[in-house]
Amino acid sequence: MFKFVMICAVLGLAVANPPVPHSLGRSEDVHADVLSQSDDVRADGFDSSLHTSNGIEQAASGDAHGNIHGNFGWISPEGEHVEVKYVANENGYQPSGAWIPTPPPIPEAIARAVAWLESHPPAPEHPRHH
């Protein structure tokens, strides 16, 4: 009787566990076609762009100094167009867009404290001679 109960319990768990999808993306993403693509590499920089049938877009331009600016976007699972613009240069990668999270504003009391500290630098320390 114990074996019968255990077999029923294992079968019950197996049936109750929903199957895990193999891909978290949309099924049409697998079959997306490239609608347009261009790459122009020159001695003084490059230009690149890509557009696919499922709404993925990318464009970038770079110069001889290593500065790059561009954008990329896609259609979210909710059907909204997501776009990110960016600059990459000596100051690093700097993305911008409505979808980029932003930090909360600095509380006024903290801003006042920082301003006070900046306007009152500490006195230089003098080494003690023993």
UniProtKB/Swiss-Prot annotation:
It comes from the Eukaryota. Disulfide bonds: none annotated. Residues 1-16 form the signal peptide. Keywords: Cuticle, Signal. One of its GO terms (cellular component) is chitin-based extracellular matrix. One of its GO terms (biological process) is larval chitin-based cuticle development. The keyword NAD does not apply. GO terms for molecular function: structural constituent of chitin-based larval cuticle. Component of the larval cuticle. PANTHER family: CUTICLE PROTEIN, CUTICULAR PROTEIN 65AU, ISOFORM A-RELATED. This is Larval cuticle protein 1. It comes from Drosophila melanogaster. The gene is Lcp1.
